[in-house]
Design a protein with these regions (language model features):
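Polybasic, glycine- and aromatic-enriched phosphate-binding surface used to engage nucleic acids
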Residues: 26-29, 33-248
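Non-catalytic DNA-recognition/assembly elements of restriction-modification systems
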Residues: 23, 27, 37-55, 243-285
Length: 285
């Protein structure tokens, strides 16, 4: 093609028309039918995740080899259990549930005196001392050499919460009830105290893992490859949430999904279908 005009005339591109009166501070360039779908959800819902939940990122160790160990490692039995935390990685998060993880985190920030914990210091973390000392926070004297780079507050992990990967092909939101810690490529959120009697974790994952909410999120998500999307909290926590007469039904079906998965059953399509229909009915889509 010798000109843009000729290229456009050839009709090999999809055309989108934007009207000034529909443009707000957040530009969303989408098909008309997708905008109708998106707007129905935005207009119907009275809450967003950021209204009812607190979000946080996983831990940055600064050197995974020093702090993350396989549960099958023979030496793990030598470590005091109070320093070992369940460690969840991105790939272990599925819809609704988390796969059995293979790893444990040594939460070394709880070590008050390195001489009191010679096994952890000498047999595990100490092997990487030189590398750990080169971390920016250690050079600035903000961290002891054996501490995690960004260990966060333990309390935010040691509670019921919803975890999700920061990159995914689809919505994957899982309930964690095992006080799991996670790597930095996993984000989590928990329901704020004032909303604990209004929303349940089971209801939220029922919505978020549905076909409707998968489509809804992707309309405004950043696409990073042919099929993968960013799931950063700046977009995830803006997801709109509703509560209406279908709340109990959706919550109950979601609990049934969780029970089946915990029992080792993989076929949940019938329950997902029912959840999706209830959501569509509520939203009028």
């Amino acid at each position: 093609f010798h000109s843009i005009e000729k290229l456009i005339e050839n009709n090999i591109f999809e055309r989108l028309i934007l009207y000034k009166n529909t443009i707000n501070k957040d530009w969303i360039i989408i098909k008309k039918e997708d905008k109708t779908f998106y707007d129905k959800i935005e207009d119907y819902c009275n809450y967003s995740l950021e209204d009812i939940c607190t979000s946080f990122q996983g831990i940055i160790t600064g050197c995974d080899k020093a702090f993350v160990i396989d549960k099958d490692d023979e030496k793990i039995n030598l470590i005091d259990d109070r320093f070992l935390k369940s460690w969840v990685k991105n790939k272990e998060i599925q819809k609704y549930t988390i796969k059995d993880n293979r790893y444990k985190l040594i939460y070394s920030n709880d070590i008050k005196n390195e001489s009191d914990n010679p096994i952890i210091i000498n047999d595990f973390i100490g092997k990487y001392k030189e590398r750990l000392l080169n971390r920016r926070e250690c050079k600035k004297k903000l961290r002891l050499w054996y501490e995690l780079q960004w260990g966060r507050e333990k309390a935010i992990f040691e509670r019921k919460k919803i975890m999700y990967p920061y990159k995914s092909f689809e919505n994957r939101f899982a309930i964690d009830e095992n006080n799991s810690f996670s790597s930095a490529d996993v984000y989590s959120f928990y329901i704020n105290k004032e909303y604990e009697e209004i929303f349940s974790y089971e209801y939220l994952v029922g919505l978020l893992n549905s076909e409707v909410y998968n489509k809804y999120f992707k309309i405004n998500a950043k696409k990073i490859s042919k099929n993968a999307y960013d799931y950063y909290p700046n977009k995830v926590m803006k997801i709109k949430i509703f509560k209406d007469s279908n709340y109990t039904h959706i919550e109950d079906l979601s609990k049934q999904v969780l029970q089946r998965l915990k029992n080792g059953e993989s076929n949940i399509s019938d329950l997902e279908y029912k959840i999706n229909n209830l959501i569509r009915g509520s939203l009028g889509i």
